[in-house]
Structure formats: C-alpha cells, structure tokens
Amino acid sequence: MAADVVTYTTLETFSHEDLVKPDPDASPLADHSSSGPEAEEDPSRSKRYERKRRYSKSSASSDDGSTGGGSVGGGKSGKNRKKTSKAESFEDLQNQRVLANVRERQRTQSLNEAFSSLRKIIPTLPSDKLSKIQTLKLAARYIDFLYQVLRSDDTDTKMASSCSYVAHERLSYAFSVSRQELYFGLGAPSSGPNHF
C-alpha cells in the first residue's frame, strides 16, 4: 500500500513536459535508477514508470504522426508553395523591372524629342552644342527677350505689318545679336569671338 502511494506521488510530480519530452542524453532506465533506494526496492514502480513513459512516448508519437503526418505533407506542400511563390515573386520582380525599363526608355525618348523641338524654336548659333540645362536657360532668355520686344511700341507696329516668318527671322537675328552683346558684356574669355 505504501509502495502504491509512493508510486502515485512520484507520477504526479512529473510534469507533462517531462513525460512527453524526455532528455535525449538519458534513457528512462537511467533516470529511474538514479531516483534513489526506493526504486531498487520496488520493481513494480519501475515498470509502472516505464509504462507511463512508453505510453506518453507512444501517444506523443501517435499525436505527432496524426498531426505531424499532416504537417509533413503540409510541409512538403508548404515547401512547394514557398518554391512556387518564390519563383512567382522572382518572375514578378523581373516583369516589374522590364516594365520600369520600358517606361524609362519612353520617358527619355519623349524628353529628348521635346528638347529637340525646343532647340528648333529657339534661335541658336551654328556653333551651339547645347546641353539640356543650357537649352532651358536659353529658352528662358529667349522668352524674356520676346517679352521685352512685345513691350516696345515700335516693334509692335513693325511686326504687325510683316509676315510671321519674316518676323521670326528678325526676332531670331535680334536675339542672336543680344546674345553676343550679353556674351561680350559679361567679359567673355579670349576665345569668345571665335566661338561666334
């Protein structure tokens, strides 16, 4: 009777984790043999403990088999899903890069076309090889020049009587002259006159 009580209390003191997850380095017999002199005296207690351990191991393995089997199958399908999702994400990334490159090419092409049409409108010198920023600065200067021309009363009457092509040529010539005056007025380098 006393042995039964000892066995009951011993089994109660083990936590669920101790029963389900045994120490991988120690065997159940080694744990049982190290429990003291009472374990040597009562072989039925050791058998009950081993049964309990075996039951907990088998139930844990059957639980793992039932849920783990699904998780292994699910793990494989999960791995396949991860592989396919990685492949799909890589393909999506490649497609996004290709589309971004196409959009950038189209944007650059339209920008270059706009600058070339702007260079045709702005009166330039034959020796001019303007960058984009220089083209924009020259366009701003030309707009200011046109504004000044429109403000003067003399040119308004002259431009109104002439055709638009001739007016454009006169404005272009006047703008070129003003550019040269500005160039020389700002203290151009010694190679400046050769530039024009």
Swiss-Prot record:
Residue ranges annotated for the bHLH domain, each copy included: 95-146
Segments of this protein annotated with the region Disordered: 1-92
Pfam families given in the database record: HLH
A GO molecular-function descriptor: RNA polymerase II transcription regulatory region sequence-specific DNA binding
Tissue: In late gastrula embryos, expressed in the presumptive first pair of somites and the middorsal wall of the primitive gut. Expression is then up-regulated in the lateral wall of the somites and the notochord. At the late neurula stage, also expressed in the anterior wall of the primitive gut and in the evaginating lateral diverticula. In the earliest larval stage, expression is restricted to both ends of the body. In 36 hour larvae, only faint expression is detected in the notochordal and paraxial mesoderm of the caudal region.
Gly residues: compositionally biased ranges: 66-77
Subcellular location: Nucleus
Composition bias type Basic and acidic residues, residue spans: 14-24
Any one of the GO BP annotations: mesoderm development
SMART domains for this protein: HLH (SM00353)
PROSITE patterns hit by this protein: BHLH
Keyword terms: Developmental protein, Differentiation, DNA-binding, Nucleus, Transcription, Transcription regulation
GO cellular component terms, semicolon-separated: nucleus
PANTHER family recorded: BASIC HELIX-LOOP-HELIX TRANSCRIPTION FACTOR, TWIST (PTHR23349), PROTEIN TWIST (PTHR23349:SF50)
Role this protein plays: Probable transcription factor with a role in initial mesoderm differentiation.
Subunit record text: Efficient DNA binding requires dimerization with another bHLH protein. Homodimer.
Protein name from the UniProt record: Twist-related protein
